[in-house]
Amino acid sequence: MEGGFGSDFGGSGSGKLDPGLIMEQVKVQIAVANAQELLQRMTDKCFRKCIGKPGGSLDNSEQKCIAMCMDRYMDAWNTVSRAYNSRLQRERANM
């Protein structure tokens, strides 16, 4: 068994680590973790808002509430994300 990160990081097989490849893999892992956290938060908030008495199935009003809640949550998240990215770009341009 090899080290904790496996052999994917070497790239050329020479045993040297490729910093660019490592950065890309870290970025992918961060993006996946962020998506999982977003989904978990959205699920928790919408469940608490829409499901009064958990049962074997969702009634029609609960289904509509969940769908609308998730749509609003994603819209809000996208709006905040765009504003944040725009601000980061402006700040980078001013450096």
From Swiss-Prot:
Annotated disulfide bonds: 46-69, 50-65
Keywords: Acetylation, Chaperone, Disulfide bond, Membrane, Metal-binding, Mitochondrion, Mitochondrion inner membrane, Phosphoprotein, Protein transport, Translocation, Transport, Zinc
Pfam assignment, any one: zf-Tim10_DDP
Tissue: Ubiquitous, with highest expression in heart, kidney, liver and skeletal muscle.
InterPro entries named in the record: Tim10-like (IPR004217), Tim10-like_dom_sf (IPR035427)
An example molecular function term from Gene Ontology annotations: zinc ion binding
Residues bearing PTM N-acetylmethionine: 1
The keyword Acetylation is annotated on this UniProt entry: yes
Known partners and oligomeric status: Heterohexamer; composed of 3 copies of TIMM8 (TIMM8A or TIMM8B) and 3 copies of TIMM13, named soluble 70 kDa complex. Associates with the TIM22 complex, whose core is composed of TIMM22.
Record's comment describing the protein's domains: The twin CX3C motif contains 4 conserved Cys residues that form 2 disulfide bonds in the mitochondrial intermembrane space. However, during the transit of TIMM13 from cytoplasm into mitochondrion, the Cys residues probably coordinate zinc, thereby preventing folding and allowing its transfer across mitochondrial outer membrane.
Similarity annotation: Belongs to the small Tim family.
Record organism: Homo sapiens
Name of the protein in its database record: Mitochondrial import inner membrane translocase subunit Tim13
Physiological role: Mitochondrial intermembrane chaperone that participates in the import and insertion of some multi-pass transmembrane proteins into the mitochondrial inner membrane. Also required for the transfer of beta-barrel precursors from the TOM complex to the sorting and assembly machinery (SAM complex) of the outer membrane. Acts as a chaperone-like protein that protects the hydrophobic precursors from aggregation and guide them through the mitochondrial intermembrane space.
Modified residues (N6-succinyllysine): 53
GO biological process: protein insertion into mitochondrial inner membrane; protein targeting to mitochondrion; sensory perception of sound
